[in-house]
From Swiss-Prot:
Species whose genome carries this gene: Chlorobium phaeobacteroides (strain BS1)
EC assignment: 1.5.1.5, 3.5.4.9
Keyword Hydrolase: yes
Cellular component per GO, a single term: cytosol
Reactions performed catalytically: (6R)-5,10-methylene-5,6,7,8-tetrahydrofolate + NADP(+) = (6R)-5,10-methenyltetrahydrofolate + NADPH; (6R)-5,10-methenyltetrahydrofolate + H2O = (6R)-10-formyltetrahydrofolate + H(+)
Name listed for the protein in its UniProt record: Bifunctional protein FolD
PANTHER family: C-1-TETRAHYDROFOLATE SYNTHASE, CYTOPLASMIC (PTHR48099:SF5), C-1-TETRAHYDROFOLATE SYNTHASE, CYTOPLASMIC-RELATED (PTHR48099)
Keywords, in A-Z order: Amino-acid biosynthesis, Histidine biosynthesis, Hydrolase, Methionine biosynthesis, Multifunctional enzyme, NADP, One-carbon metabolism, Oxidoreductase, Purine biosynthesis
UniProt pathway annotation: One-carbon metabolism; tetrahydrofolate interconversion
Length: 298
């Protein structure tokens, strides 16, 4: 059984990106810039933003964090995004979720220039992805990171049956579409399961690859997996644990302790998919910079 180590793959990728950023600096006397906007004081969001900023600095990218109070109006936020759209030193714009209830998520997504939408959420980027024009878009970071793990671990995917559990716009839908694409990391027969699927264990037991992104702690159990399946756990859930100083522990959407006895390869939580999400955000930001400066990928 192979443990797919996203933490190590992410570290390796960051080193490669650091080299690429330095090569860009030597060619253009400039480096990629990522700006993250956070509205309000959600503690988890602040941790995520700090991690993104730290990762940027580690590879030599410029990182700017704009902190706005929770009472910021939608119009004020959209005006700030427009200013960043027009700033040539900004190559990636990310608005940290969740936003306060009075701000429309869709309006914010639409306001970001598709060429700077390094989260890959703008309909133009989603549409290009669905059409298979992956060189003309940004791919949503978590699904992109999973493809990278398949590539780095030489997971055989062509013609395999892949079951994606979850249909969110951030992971489930783009992941299912990417697994359909004619890529060396995908090219699968794809089934999507979700909260209204009545016979889910029957379906998942047929899968060569299971990607769990349903947001339920340890939902995927050993009896739902066939022997030798590859299991990718996207979930990050807090469960109470009085034995821990924090009072909780992190678990995924998969019952790791039991499923790993049956799987041929599996991602742990933490340390599996999570670290890849930020790494692919950096990769998308670098790609944005390279498109602006007409630099071809190595």
């Amino acid at each position: 059984m192979t443990i797919i180590d996203g933490k190590q793959v992410s570290a390796n990728l960051k080193q490669e990106l650091k080299t690429a950023v330095e090569a860009c600096r030597q060619k253009t006397d400039a480096v990629p810039g990522l700006t993250v906007i956070i509205v309000g004081e959600d503690p988890a969001s602040q941790v995520y933003v700090r991690n993104k900023s730290k990762s940027c600095k580690e590879i030599g990218m410029n990182s700017t964090v704009i902190e706005l109070p929770a009472e910021t109006t939608e119009a004020e936020l959209l005006a700030g995004i427009e200013a960043l759209n027009n700033d040539n030193d900004v190559h990636g714009i990310l608005v940290q979720q969740p936003l306060p209830a009075h701000i429309d998520d869709y309006a914010v997504t639409m306001a970001i220039l598709p060429s700077k939408d390094v989260d890959g959420f703008h309909p133009e980027n989603v549409g290009q992805m669905v059409l298979g024009n992956l060189d003309k878009c940004f791919i949503s970071c978590t699904p992109y990171g999973i493809l990278e793990l398949f590539s780095r671990y030489s997971i055989e995917t062509k013609g395999k049956h892949c079951v994606v559990i979850g249909r969110s716009n951030i992971v489930g839908k783009p992941m299912a579409n990417l697994m359909l694409q004619k890529l060396k990391e995908s090219n699968c027969t794809v089934t999507i399961c979700h909260s209204a699927t009545s016979n889910m264990p029957e379906i998942t037991r047929q899968a060569d690859i299971v990607i769990a992104a349903i947001g339920r702690p340890e939902y995927v159990t050993e009896d739902m997996i066939k022997p030798g399946a590859v299991v990718i756990d996207v979930g990050i859930n807090r469960v109470e644990d009085p034995s821990r100083k924090s009072g909780y522990r992190l678990v995924g959407d998969v019952d790791y302790e039991n499923v790993n006895k049956k799987a041929s390869a599996i991602t742990p939580v933490p340390g599996g998919v999570g670290p890849m999400t930020i790494a692919m955000l950096l990769k998308n930001t670098l790609q944005s910079f390279m498109r602006v400066h007409n630099i071809e990928s190595a």
